[in-house]
């Protein structure tokens, strides 16, 4: 099985955040790979990865980084594939530095950016992109969204049972 999504993180310290993306891709049965590459420590390897990703069959790249967070932008500069950036909380600025680094890209080098530590939404966005050309995946994703809706419906039913003197519903 060949991966169609690549999850790249600046270091394995980002793994606890990025596992959420991996679990969602696994649940949706989307083949993926996970690797650590650093825009600052392994710049040549990042360039090689980005330039060869499409040829290897990758369709979407999810790139996570904290602090200066150059990784998603460097990857985007070296590929025509969509890149989804995940700013990782981990510095004294609670990930805001990473968010600004990833979201402030120059024209022509976009990185679709999710919330700080938003790996789950990054995977969801990747699945939505892939589902445009994959009817089976689109059905799986629709079922996933229906499940999210059902959780809220159930929660509201449970909240009806919560009693307070001045609660009106």
Residue positions per predicted region:
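Structural motif
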Residues: 4-7, 33, 59-61, 81-84, ...
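Short beta->alpha connector loops at strand-helix junctions that form conserved
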Residues: 9, 65, 86-89, 114-115
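N-terminal beta-loop-helix "entrance" segment that forms/cooperates
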Residues: 34-55
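C-terminal binding/interaction regions
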Residues: 3, 9-16, 20, 96-169
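Short glycine/serine/threonine-rich phosphate/pyrophosphate-binding segments
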Residues: 14-18, 42-46, 65-74, 93-96, ...
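Glycine/small-residue-rich loop that forms an oxyanion/phosphate-binding "nest" at active or ligand-binding sites
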Residues: 67, 78-102, 107
């Amino acid at each position: 099985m060949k991966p169609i999504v690549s999850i790249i993180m600046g270091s394995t310290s980002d793994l606890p955040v990025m596992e959420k993306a991996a679990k969602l891709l696994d649940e949706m049965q989307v083949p993926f790979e996970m690797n650590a590459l650093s825009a600052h420590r392994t710049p040549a390897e990042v360039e090689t990865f980005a330039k060869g990703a499409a040829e290897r069959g990758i369709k979407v790249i999810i790139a996570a980084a904290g602090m200066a967070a150059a990784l998603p932008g460097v990857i985007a500069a070296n590929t025509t594939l969509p890149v989804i950036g995940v700013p990782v909380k981990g510095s004294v600025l609670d990930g805001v530095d990473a968010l600004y680094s990833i979201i402030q890209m120059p024209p022509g080098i976009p990185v679709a950016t999710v919330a700080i530590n938003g790996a789950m939404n990054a995977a969801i966005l990747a699945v939505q992109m892939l589902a445009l050309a994959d009817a089976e995946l689109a059905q799986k994703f629709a079922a996933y969204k229906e499940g999210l809706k059902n959780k809220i419906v159930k929660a509201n039913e449970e909240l009806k049972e919560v009693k307070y003197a001045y609660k009106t519903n």
